[in-house]
Swiss-Prot record:
Example GO molecular function: guanyl-nucleotide exchange factor activity
Entry's localization field: Cytoplasm, Cytosol
Organism: Homo sapiens
Pfam families attached to this UniProt entry: LbH_EIF2B (PF25084), NTP_transferase (PF00483)
Gene field: EIF2B3
Keyword line: Acetylation, Cytoplasm, Disease variant, Initiation factor, Leukodystrophy, Phosphoprotein, Protein biosynthesis
Disease named in the record: Leukoencephalopathy with vanishing white matter 3: An autosomal recessive brain disease characterized by neurological features including progressive cerebellar ataxia, spasticity, and cognitive deficits. Brain imaging shows abnormal white matter that vanishes over time and is replaced by cerebrospinal fluid. Disease severity ranges from fatal infantile forms to adult forms without neurological deterioration. The disease is progressive with, in most individuals, additional episodes of rapid deterioration following febrile infections or minor head trauma.
Name under which the protein is recorded: Translation initiation factor eIF2B subunit gamma
Function: Acts as a component of the translation initiation factor 2B (eIF2B) complex, which catalyzes the exchange of GDP for GTP on the eukaryotic initiation factor 2 (eIF2) complex gamma subunit. Its guanine nucleotide exchange factor activity is repressed when bound to eIF2 complex phosphorylated on the alpha subunit, thereby limiting the amount of methionyl-initiator methionine tRNA available to the ribosome and consequently global translation is repressed.
An individual GO BP term: response to peptide hormone
């Protein structure tokens, strides 16, 4: 077994809490499948037979009851009161990890050819290989935003070599001063660096086993994304000998601590005697200067996905966008599953668009139009209803003559007769009164708050 696959399904979805307060984030419906189905399906498609899923007890119960895959999941539940980052989660399952690791987030939806990331990891004997995509701005409004401009998220500054594969620099603009400082040791080996500010981390990582060993002994690192990876990128161009020389100048106790926590001591234990493959050294000849990979002990690489679907469902806007895009993806992944479930009852079938999905046991009345929308299971949509560019979860009732556009309607909500709803988020169990007009509103329970 070359890799052990690990799916992280612990995060509570802090940026979409009005959705996740009643449904755990890994179980949020996307295209009428739980969100966690997508990374699990990706692994199964490329031949993984086992996967470790780190999650909560609520998600474990649902997976055990509904898991319909050939792949065998080893579900590990974190303590209910634990506040664990992704690095903490790897430490928690450390006794199970015997080989190099492939880590995925439960909110990743992608049709990437996974072998492109894995082949990069193999060819260059990398410490880390990760997946990134070019950022894509959705032109669709986000429900409940009330006309405000979308908050500008801080960018990552990503530096790569002339091949676009070697990851040379990585920092968030929040961590940078007014000037961008590049170490001389990097420029010596790579005088030409190409910087990107529009790339998004997909949270898919191949990691050497010694990286996990290092994490086990360094409890101060809690996050793979924000702490471990920037550390590894920086460590590529500092030698073990210079690190040791620096440590010798410190006090004895501090020197001993640094030595035990530094990545190079773990590389020595793992594979100091194993030089990088000849092919890797040869491949590194491309560009301005030849680099002897056998001397560069920490090596970080990135596969930048330029085409296809690659999205992380981390906000309401991205959740809506994922539901718009997955019908096309599912037609390729699950061609045996029709977009309209066989148990659904639809009076005016010609008014249901081919770009929509209809779940089991749903009833749609006469002259009701469904366009570019995902409708969950056991919904009741009565006569003369118009639903456009929406997501309706399970057991939603929409009464006669209602019009819903660009909205998310959560489980068990009721939209009464003649209501007009546009760009809204209606929480679980909420009721919208007859003939109401709602625009750009978030209507949820008092215990549900969200950052949009």
């Amino acid at each position: 077994m070359e890799f052990q696959a690990v799916v992280m399904a612990v995060g509570g979805g802090s940026r979409m809490t009005d959705l996740t307060s009643s449904i755990p984030k890994p179980l949020l419906p996307v295209g009428n499948k739980p969100l966690i189905w997508y990374p699990l399906n990706l692994l199964e498609r490329v031949g993984f037979e086992e996967v470790i899923v780190v999650t909560t007890r609520d998600v474990q119960k649902a997976l055990c009851a509904e898991f319909k895959m050939k792949m065998k999941p080893d579900i590990v539940c974190i303590p209910d009161d634990a506040d664990m980052g992704t690095a903490d989660s790897l430490r928690y399952i450390y006794p199970k990890l015997k080989t190099d690791v492939l880590v995925l987030s439960c909110d990743l939806i992608t049709d990437v050819a996974l072998h492109e990331v894995v082949d990069l990891f193999r060819a260059y004997d990398a410490s880390l290989a990760m997946l990134m995509r070019k950022g894509q701005d959705s032109i669709e409004p986000v429900p409940g935003q009330k006309g405000k401009k979308k908050a500008v998220e801080q960018r990552d500054f990503i530096g790569v070599d002339s091949t676009g594969k070697r990851l040379l620099f990585m920092a968030n603009e929040a961590d940078l001063d007014e000037e961008l400082v590049i170490k001389g040791s990097i420029l010596q080996k790579h005088p030409r660096i190409r910087f990107h500010t529009g790339l998004v981390d997909a949270h898919l990582y191949c990691l050497k086993k010694y990286i996990v060993d290092f994490l086990m002994e360094n409890g101060s690192i809690t996050s793979i994304r924000s702490e471990l990876i920037p550390y590894l990128v920086r460590k590529q161009f500092s030698s073990a000998s210079s690190q040791q020389g620096q440590e010798e100048k410190e006090e004895d106790l501090k020197k001993k601590e640094l030595k035990s926590l530094d990545i190079y001591s773990f590389i020595k234990e793992a594979n100091t005697l194993n030089l990088a493959p000849y092919d890797a050294c040869w491949n590194a000849c491309r560009g301005d200067r030849w680099e002897d990979l056998s001397r560069s002990q920490v090596r970080c690489y990135v596969h930048i996905m330029k085409e296809g679907l690659c999205s992380r469902v981390s906000t309401l806007g991205l959740y809506m966008e994922a539901n718009r895009q997955v019908p096309k993806l599912l037609s390729a992944l699950c061609p045996e599953e029709p977009p309209v479930h066989s148990s659904a009852q639809i009076v005016s079938k010609h008014l249901v668009g081919v770009d929509s999905l209809i779940g089991p046991e749903t009833q749609i009345g006469e002259k009701s139009s469904i366009k570019r929308s995902v409708i969950g299971s056991s919904c009741l949509i009565k006569d003369r209803v118009t639903i456009t560019n929406c997501l309706l979860m399970n057991s939603v009732t929409v009464e006669e003559g209602s019009n819903i556009q660009g909205s998310v309607i959560c489980n068990n909500a009721v939209i009464e007769k003649g209501a007009d709803i546009k760009d809204c988020l209606i929480g679980s169990g909420q009721r919208i009164e007859a003939k109401a007009k709602r625009v750009n509103e978030v209507i949820v329970g008092n215990d549900q708050l969200m950052e949009i």
